[in-house]
Amino acid sequence: MMRVRPVERRDLADILELAGKTGVGMTSLPQNEQHLAARIERALNTWQGSLAVGEQGYLFVLEDTEREKVVGVSAIEVAVGMNDPWYNFRVGTLVHASKTLNVYKSVPTLFLSNDHTGYSELCTLFLDPEYRKDKNGPFLSKVRFLFIAAFRQHFSRKLIAEMRGYTDEQGRSPFWENVGRHFFSIEFAKADYLSGTGQKAFIAELMPKHPLYVDFLAEEARAVIGQVHPHTAPARAVLETEGLQYQGYVDIFDGGPTLEANTDEVRAVRDSSQRKVVIDDIDIDPSGSAYLVANDRYQEFRSILINTHLSDEFLHLTPDNAAALGVVAGDVVRIISLFAPETKK
């Protein structure tokens, strides 16, 4: 059975193994044991309530319970940019006009921005390639919305998600080669790694404070502004079906898009509901629709994916499913359809 739960210290080895499979461009999951161990500790301290808002970050794992192995991760940062500045480029416009010469020209530009400071961030989504099937990807991504809905008071009015930008098969980023390299004089992978391990002072020290003219960039760089890595396209589609949208902000390293939405308007947050548990000694109807189900326990959060038909205010679970969630008959669980009705697969 596949189950999502909060990270534990014993998961470090599995997460380090996952980090070795991400490739270049995923800054929040570097293959660095010390950094990942600290990330786990920060998540544990977040659940224990011992951190300031700007330091809080939740980390969830997708566990194959039969193998007792972590095969995916996803995370939520509670409020970005409250300690270290949060940078991205805002894709904007400058107008150059002259009545004398009868010239009027709109010029696309990139402005260094901290506009998303204080927003909650969906991040660190990675699924072992072996498990990219059976709806595991949407499950691992969207389970965060159930957690946010259940514990709404912990999160900002806005949600953002930085999408991994385009790099080629050799890990080369056209955006970096035409923008970042001119200011940093280091390889994309090195800058990516430094940022991912929290060493971000160099960004403030070296990035330009004035707008960059997009037309001055090579075509290969212009073409990837706001575009995602091919492997990230499914993750982007998942978030867009929930209501997150690209609003003209891109990553300063690879030009990947930032998606955003009002937290309360995200479909899986807004439309999730609570139901009482009934336990039946029968299998869940495989012909039913896919639903995310989660218990309502903050520190012992558990979520699974089931197929069922909803007909009343109760949710029927098998004993195995109830055990995976840590619930008994009469407990309340939160539920949401995995797919929006109009995008059901």
From Swiss-Prot:
Catalyzes the transfer of succinyl-CoA to arginine to produce N(2)-succinylarginine. It comes from the Bacteria. The keyword Cell cycle does not apply. Succinyl-CoA binds at L125. It comes from Yersinia enterocolitica serotype O:8 / biotype 1B (strain NCTC 13174 / 8081). NCBIfam families: arg_catab_AOST, arg_catab_AstA, PRK10456.1. This is Arginine N-succinyltransferase. Its EC number is 2.3.1.109. Keywords: Acyltransferase, Arginine metabolism, Transferase. Pfam families: AstA. Pathway: Amino-acid degradation; L-arginine degradation via AST pathway; L-glutamate and succinate from L-arginine: step 1/5. It catalyses: succinyl-CoA + L-arginine = N(2)-succinyl-L-arginine + CoA + H(+). SUPFAM superfamilies: Acyl-CoA N-acyltransferases (Nat). GO terms for biological process: arginine catabolic process to glutamate; arginine catabolic process to succinate. It is an enzyme of class 2 (transferase). InterPro entries: Acyl_CoA_acyltransferase (IPR016181), Arg_succinylTrfase_AstA/AruG (IPR007041), Arginine_N-succinylTrfase (IPR017650). Belongs to the arginine N-succinyltransferase family. GO terms for molecular function: arginine N-succinyltransferase activity. The active site is at H229 (proton donor). Gene3D superfamilies: 2.40.40.20.
